[in-house]
């Protein structure tokens, strides 16, 4: 029987929190490494959520961060790229690159992801396995046919943990405040709930547009 560690990615979201609990129940806390990508734009309530999850898991959650960027706004400001056909640049810089580093440094048995039992998420899991075959990904919620609403129920009624504040405010995820992949409705809600975050994003967009216009003018020989 293998004693290689199992890496479980804890995102401060409900589904990942439940997936981590299921995998600890299956393999034992000693074999599971819980890892969280921390960013500066997370809701302060996440600190409470981390501590309560750690108490239920019986072990600490490791904190990992990007060496280059503090949050999605830092990525957007420095790269001048917000979102596009290939997705948001912040996903690569704040999550994927950090995950790649852990993968390179660890001889692991599996990696655990909190994709819930939902048609869209099942297809996402299939694409993930095809795209990253060496990740050795497993999806406890899909395997156990646990949906997101069922995960919320499990978190609060089985684990005894109150849902993160962002869910209580009506958001569907808890990765960050001010998701660059959010649509107009999402950002209208951010403007009401977190006006400082909305203003920060608007400033970054204005600065990016000014820089692009200046470069276009220089390229056209306009002084």
Map each language-model feature to its residues.
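Nucleotide-activated chemistry modules centered on ATP-dependent adenylation/adenylyltransferase
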Residues: 1-223
